[in-house]
Amino acid sequence: MAITIKKVSTKKELKQFIRFNYKLYKNNPYSVPDLYDDMLNTFNKKKNAAFEFCEADYFLAYKENQIVGRVAAIINNKANQTWNKKEVRFGWIDFIDDPEVSEALIRTVEEWGKERGMTHIQGPLGFTDFDAEGMLIEGYDQLSTMATTYNYPYYPQHMERMGFEKDADWVEYKIYIPDAIPDKHKRISDLIQRKYNLKIKKYSSAKKIARDYGQAIFELMNEAYSPLYGYSALSQRQIDQYVKMYLPILDLRMVTLITDAEDKLIAVGISMPSLSEALQKSHGRLLPFGWYHLLKALFMKRRAKMLDLLLVAVKPEYQNKGVNALLFSDLIPVYQKLGFVFAESNPELELNGKVQAQWEYFKTEQHKRRRAFIKAI
């Protein structure tokens, strides 16, 4: 039976696009659904600030009048300009285990990209680094996180069959929370705090942290992450959007800022309780009862034993000087007090030695790996 590809053009079809992932992974113990309303906003060209510099279309694959696959075709013009590339991205790709389906989806993205002057196709990638990146190639028996996507083992097999090659890998670590701050960690943090006259800043009010350092946090990200794979700087509209979206839901005990002698932000560490199990229980919906599971995971005492390390950023001139040790010397006692057993690092670029070096004094387990693929079109 022939595969039919249809561009999403109505709100009903967009909802089907989002829900196909839920259907394909229904009852899968490792997949964590995205929040449905967040996905609606992400794909909305009027609401997502990334569309200032991105263009995209979404496609559904049908077989015998049933949806059997989906994919987003994306061009991040800012990233292409930054890295001097002509690449079309495929993102949010899902398909049944049928080569005709995956080939039809990828062929559609290739043709869409060619029409717009692109020379290569890469992915899975989203609009920006704030979207999930990479296809899982190791760790299929591990629970996914809110910041990543899960996929079946047959996905990368389809990619390789279609001639895709490795473009970049991310690794993920399970980091066990120590009973005490490692001695060397403590010595390093004390030394660099005195040497550079650094201060640890903590907040209890989302409004105050947004007022004082909301803008600076995301400007620091632009500085720290600019050399990383595919990164494109956040625009002012994106920064405003993220400050409004993310800061109010954080447990600020798990947010540590480090400033210099002039109170300028030089490092930030942001973590939060894992929402993986809560999102599974809510099935990606806030209503009618999904909000309860999420609030319980975030703020109630009987929370998950796992936390997610969402963001660690250090100003370039302070990297490799022990600032990460200072961040975690403040955060580890918080994790212990709140009863966390281990942390998920979330994806780190395989070749980013600076990031992986910060786990040197912890017991860790590299338990997942994901890949971005690329090929000429």
For the regions a language model picked out, list residue spans one by one.
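Acyltransferase donor/substrate-recognition loop-hinge adjacent to the catalytic core
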Residues: 3, 149-230
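Acyl-donor binding region in acyl/amide transferases
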Residues: 82-163, 282-361
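An acidic- and aromatic-residue-enriched active-site/binding cleft used to recognize and process polar
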Residues: 74-78, 93-95, 126-128, 178, ...
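A conserved beta-strand-loop-helix scaffold within acyl/acetyltransferase catalytic domains
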Residues: 21-63, 71-81, 204, 208-209, ...
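Generic start-of-chain signal for non-secretory N-termini
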Residues: 1-30
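Short hydrophobic/aromatic beta-strand or adjacent loop that forms the aromatic wall/cage
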Residues: 56, 168-172, 368-372
